[in-house]
Amino acid sequence: NDLEFTELFQCDVYVYLSNHHPLAGRDKITFEELVDYPCLSFEQGDKNSFYFAEEVFSTLQYKQMIKADDRATMLNLMVGMNGYTLCSGIICEELNGDGYSAIPLETDEKMTIGYIKRKGMHISHIGKSYIEILRGYA
C-alpha cells in the first residue's frame, strides 16, 4: 500500500464531554458510567474501514452510537444529548471553546498517536512544525 506509520507517543484514553454533562467534574469515568449516554463518532465516509477509525475502542458495540462528519455537530450533540467521545485528551480550546472537558477513562488501554505518510515522500516544513507541536504533548 506504500504507506508508513510513524508513532509519536502513547497516551491515556479520555472521555470528552460537555461541562454540563452529568459526569463532568469527575476525576475518572468508567465504561459502566457511560452506558446510558450516546457515544459520538466521526463518520469516515462510504469506504470506511475500522483500520482507519480515529476513535479508540471503535470495534466495541455501544448501546447508542451517533456518527457525525463535522466538529460543530459533535459539539452540539455533546451539549444537547449529553453525548461523549473518546479521545487522546489533546484538546484545542481555541477551536472548541471552553465548555468541554477531557476526563480520564478508567482503563489500562493506551492510544497510539502518530501519522501516516506515503513511503518516500518528504514532509513539508509546515508538516514538520505540526509534528513537533504534537510531540510536545507526549
Language model features: what each stretch is:
Residues 20-29, 107-109, 120-126:
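Short helix-loop capping/hinge motifs at secondary-structure junctions, enriched
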Residues 56-65, 99-100:
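A local structural motif
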Residues 2-12, 72-120:
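Beta-alpha-beta core module
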Residues 50, 70-72:
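Conserved glycosyltransferase catalytic-site signature
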Residues 2-39, 43:
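Flexible hinge/capping segments at coil-to-helix
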